[in-house]
Design a protein with these regions (language model features):
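Long, contiguous internal "core" modules enriched in hydrophobic/ aromatic residues
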Residues: 34, 38-65, 154-354, 450
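Hydrophobic alpha-helical transmembrane segments
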Residues: 93-101, 353-362, 428-429
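Extracellular/periplasmic helix-loop-helix junctions in multi-pass membrane proteins
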Residues: 256-260, 332, 370-371, 396-416
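Extramembrane terminal tails and long inter-domain/linker segments of multi-pass membrane proteins
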Residues: 1-44, 147-161, 191-227, 300, ...
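Central hydrophobic cores of alpha-helical transmembrane segments
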Residues: 376-386
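C-terminal TM-helix exit segments that contain a strictly Trp-centered aromatic cap at the helix terminus
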Residues: 59-65, 133-144, 319-326, 387-398
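Extended C-terminal subregions enriched in glycine
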Residues: 349-374
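Transmembrane-helix bundle segments that line or gate the permeation/cavity pathway
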Residues: 2-23, 64-74, 79-82, 89-219, ...
Length: 463
């Protein structure tokens, strides 16, 4: 039943199918639910989970040491007061955008190819936002006072500075996380009921039963589910654009050369979707191989995601060219120097590496043979993730290191604690993700069933 990636099953139109033929409602349900309920935990789950757990311990150690010693353990100093922490914050927030785009925008556009990938993409969004939220809190120096960011009654009658984009970040990211969590949970409810009905373990049955909230599959339940899904999709859709736009305001309202640019909002949004789809591919390709899901996550899914990655990559490439052109055309010596410093300054290798990763290498995606080659696609996705991290690093560190006054110039070098904190959040992300795929259906059971020919309805009569 599994699809051969070198010879994918096609429909008469010549396009690969969204689900391999031969499946029934029962076989789809059995295949996905068995990963959680009946299969023994495989070795290929334990090994990466233990690695992720080790990296999580590194993160906890780094955070504990930071709380004791302060942010001075990082490499930040005047003039580079934003280092890896804010770089990682922007990078993780960007990764989460693909999950919201897949689950919300593609739902509103009635794109059925989302059905096999939206569940774990939404989980990816939540875990990425959780990792992103760590860095601004730790960067405060006194993270236990984070509630000062929120307007609350206090004896001093002091309120946050609502004209600061850092405050906008708090509300944008918290709203994004809340809506994404609600959307993810609402989509899980029908499948949680399926696991409840199939679970043999009493505790598992009780847990899934509580989470399913009394779902019985009645027509009224489905009607309310559809209404809630569309409402949440409508709420989440503008968040795809607004969250990274607000994050870009952290830079655009500043007068730092290389930051004060109107191109940043669309540039940041495109880059977020670019890196987000790269992460979805990094997760989808091993998952379909390890769990034998090639018949549910087909080459058509991978090809479509590669096309989205190519399209957003072209927008990012245009932004790079336009950014350099505006610096030259403006005639502003500080803007021209900022761009020249990126290309030839002490951080020039970083800049040219990001140009290769984000602009040059992904052009191979124009060829279908590359888009449908699993190994190339996986390498390309890792390349984009690296390139987008380097882009944030160049924007933040390189711009701050040399601004207006040469006597104030300084250089940033990360410490072992910068590295430990960043690598630790990668461990946190995969720790949560591996727990998710072991305890929840990573693919939406009921939505994949709608892709079957048996689910089609003609003139009001089900086939």
């Amino acid at each position: 039943m599994a699809e051969d990636p070198r010879n994918p099953v096609t429909v008469p139109s010549g396009r690969p199918t969204l689900i391999a033929p031969g499946h029934t409602f029962g076989s789809v349900t059995d295949k996905i639910s068995s990963i959680v309920l009946t299969r023994r935990t495989p070795l290929f789950w334990f090994v990466p989970f233990l690695i992720a757990s080790g990296l999580l311990m590194v993160f906890l150690t780094a955070v504990a040491y930071l709380l004791v010693r302060g942010v001075g353990i990082w490499g930040i100093k005047v003039p580079v007061m934003w280092g890896w922490a804010i770089t990682n914050f922007v990078w993780w927030i960007g990764i989460g955008h693909a999950g919201t785009l897949i689950s919300a925008i593609l739902l509103l556009l009635r794109q059925s190819w989302r059905n096999s990938i939206n569940r774990f993409a939404e989980a990816m969004t939540l875990f990425a936002v959780a990792c992103a939220g760590m860095f601004p809190l730790l960067h405060l120096g006194r993270p236990w006072l984070f509630y000062w960011f929120f307007p609350y009654p206090n004896s001093m009658n002091i309120q946050p500075q609502f004209r600061s984009p850092l405050i906008w970040d708090v509300f944008a990211v918290s709203t994004y996380a809340t809506v994404s969590a609600l959307f993810w949970f609402v989509g899980l409810i029908p499948d949680l009921a399926t696991l409840r009905d199939r679970a043999r373990n009493r505790w598992a049955r009780a847990t899934y039963g509580i989470l399913a909230m009394g779902w019985r599959g009645a027509a009224s339940h489905w009607q309310k589910y559809e209404t809630a899904s569309l409402l949440l999709a409508g709420l989440a859709t503008p968040l795809v654009l607004s969250v990274h736009t607000v994050v870009s305001f952290d830079f655009t309202i500043a007068i730092v050369p290389g930051w004060h640019s109107t191109i940043f909002p669309p540039y940041f949004v495109a880059g977020a979707i670019y890196s987000g789809f790269a992460m979805v591919l990094v997760l989808a390709i091993p998952l379909r191989a390890m769990y034998g899901l090639e018949d549910l996550i087909t080459m058509r899914h991978l090809d479509n995601m590669a096309k989205v990655m190519l399209a957003t990559g072209e927008i990012v490439a245009y932004s790079y060219v336009f950014e350099a052109f505006i610096a030259w055309y403006s005639g502003n010596p500080f803007e021209m120097f900022a761009m020249w410093n990126r290309m030839t300054g002490p951080y020039a290798p970083t800049y040219w590496l990001l140009i290769f990763c984000n602009l040059v290498f992904p052009q191979l995606l124009w060829w279908k043979k590359i888009r449908t080659n699993i190994v190339w696609l996986f390498v390309m996705s890792l390349d984009v993730l690296l390139g987008m991290w380097l882009e944030r690093y160049v924007i933040i560190v390189v711009s701050l290191s040399r601004d207006y006054v040469p006597s104030a110039w300084g250089y940033y070098w990360p410490t072992i604690w910068d590295v430990a904190t960043y690598v630790g959040t990668i461990g946190l992300f995969f720790f949560l993700f591996f727990l998710f795929i072991r305890s929840m259906p990573m693919i939406s059971i009921f939505e994949v069933r709608t892709l079957l020919p048996q689910a089609e309805v003609t003139e009001g009569v089900e086939k």
